[in-house]
Amino acid sequence: KFTWNPRNVVLSGQGTAQFIENGKLKYVPYHRLFREKKMVNILNEGPFEMYANRDSLLYMDVYGLSDIPNIIRGTLRAVGFCEAWDALIQIGLTDADFPILNSGNITYHELLDAYVDQYNGGTLRERVAQLLNKPANSTVMDQLEWLGLFRKKKIKHNFATPALILENLLREKWTLQPEDKDMIIMQHEVEYIKGGKKFLKISSMKLLGENGHETAMSKTVGLPLGIFVKLVLDGKISARGVQIPVMKEVYEPVLRELENEYSVIFNEKLTVL
């Protein structure tokens, strides 16, 4: 469900991702991004899907990693998400570049039909399955059905882009309820050589929200900034001007307070390879 800007969720990934793997630059354009997912095992949580997140190369100079053979930043999603989201992309429902004429007077069924009119015969569900090269009884098709894309219900948004229509439809399904609890997961995997031996260090963090208002997302986004501002006001940060938090005098006290006061904790596992 949504715990941050819904529009950003719908438009996420709409730029070529770039990273380095085995010493080579890799580029993944938007139309392939969710198809080229990787499986990642999260410490104590099991498998998740990961797709490359924009420009991983930005972090090389910031962290002094200009000569490493592998660097990739990814977004984690539950297993099955990437295939379903790729279906929305292939249909064309994440396009934010053009308004659909008379969109306020057509149904979701009619909208989807306009995308697959060239496919002959069968129900709308069967023709969408042809477009996606999926069985009509596949899980992805069930997910599109659950979302409400086959309903003969009016969209009721005039001159809306496909992305806006999708966003509003997702808001119906993905709005946090008061009793809901979100979950944030972050994991770093670092391979390095020390003393002639190769190691893998995994540092993993999981945080659950309290309810639909006090979310894990709001804590992990808001608390670091709040702690930093307090440190500045207390005169404990000497840096001046616009800074990013990669200095020890910033990240050490912030991480320490996050762990001690708010249970934002990274667990680590070290393995000899």
Each predicted region: which residue ranges?
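C-terminal catalytic/substrate-binding lobe primarily of soluble NAD(P)-dependent oxidoreductases
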Residues: 1-273
